[in-house]
């Protein structure tokens, strides 16, 4: 029996090695932690590194028993989807993220600006057809238990295009101006205020702070509308996408850590600005591990390398 057990154990370790071999710096996360990945700016029919990064995500999810994936907007470039039967679903999502480890966990989704070129309602309705796709509303919150402890983590998923005047004034984002952004801001505020959870994490598509060539009004609108709430209500992190590179920022005088997840396909150059702790232009995804005492995140690029690791202590 002992010999049989050793054979089984050796086989299990060998399979784990194979699953992690493309990850240049694989790190085994605590099994008792809440472990998840962040993906954003994804769907390009597998090109621009998307298919390769999807493979890496599958290996990471299998290697570390990931609990879920948070999608920080723009899952379907360039024009979102027109309906739940749009062929874009298969071409840019279903046929790309095919690893078993990615099929059997929930994907919690928020829309980005590209979804507003199509039907945001279809993004929500697809939740009724897909076992893994979770978009119950334009903005929503979930609680996740940290391992088997009584400690919980609050995730607040928000809808950022309506918070930015640039999109509200552009007819090509016709659904944005119809949204009551002040109602959403009141909801974000009350959700954070009423939470006694150990960690409070807000996830949206557009950054509050970031280096980018995109219009500065995007960040100033986010700072005056969302940033104040995040700081006043003591959110621990704000995680976003949109800029297509990795950034970690904590401007002077701010208590929130601002994380920009890179694109899971096509990336862009980046420079350091005031408040930058780290930046990297490569495409990839973010791996996160939450315990009672620490929130640790890893930026993993398209080569499978961990280009940055940072821990926030409670």
Q: Where does each model-flagged region fall?
A:
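N-terminal active-site segment of His-dependent metallophosphoesterases
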Residues: 19-88
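Residue-level marker for buried hydrophobic side chains located in beta-strands
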Residues: 36-38, 69-71, 109, 202, ...
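Active-site flanking residues adjacent to catalytic metal/cofactor-binding acidic residues
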Residues: 40-41, 73-74, 158, 204, ...
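Residue-level signal for glycine
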Residues: 304-306
């Amino acid at each position: 029996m002992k010999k049989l057990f050793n054979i089984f154990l050796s086989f299990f370790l060998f399979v784990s090695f194979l699953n992690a071999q493309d990850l240049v710096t694989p790190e085994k996360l605590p099994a008792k932690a809440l472990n998840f990945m962040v993906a954003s700016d994804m769907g390009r029919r597998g090109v621009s590194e998307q298919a390769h990064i999807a493979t890496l995500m599958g290996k990471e999810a299998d290697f570390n028993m990931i609990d879920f994936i948070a999608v920080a907007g723009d899952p379907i470039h360039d024009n979102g989807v027109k309906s739940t039967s749009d062929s874009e679903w298969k071409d840019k999502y279903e046929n790309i993220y095919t690893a078993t480890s990615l099929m059997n966990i929930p994907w919690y989704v928020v829309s980005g600006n590209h979804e507003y070129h199509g039907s945001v309602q279809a993004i929500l309705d697809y939740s009724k057809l897909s076992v893994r796709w979770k978009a119950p509303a334009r903005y929503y919150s979930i609680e996740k238990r940290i391992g088997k402890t009584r400690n919980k983590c609050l995730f607040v998923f928000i809808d950022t295009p309506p918070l930015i005047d640039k999109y509200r004034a552009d007819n090509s984002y016709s659904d944005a101006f119809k949204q009551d952004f002040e109602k959403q801001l009141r909801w974000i505020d009350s959700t954070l205020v009423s939470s006694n959870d150990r960690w409070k994490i807000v996830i949206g598509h557009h950054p509050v702070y970031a280096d980018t060539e995109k219009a500065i009004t995007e960040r100033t609108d986010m700072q005056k509308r969302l940033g104040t709430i995040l700081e006043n209500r003591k959110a621990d992190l704000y995680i976003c996408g949109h800029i297509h590179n990795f950034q970690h920022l904590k401007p002077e005088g701010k208590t929130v850590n601002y994380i920009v997840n890179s694109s899971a396909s096509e990336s862009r150059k980046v420079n350091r600005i005031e408040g930058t702790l780290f930046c990297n232009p490569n495409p990839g995804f973010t791996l996160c591990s939450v315990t009672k005492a620490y929130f640790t995140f890893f930026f993993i690029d398209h080569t499978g390398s961990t280009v940055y690791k940072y821990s926030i202590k409670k």
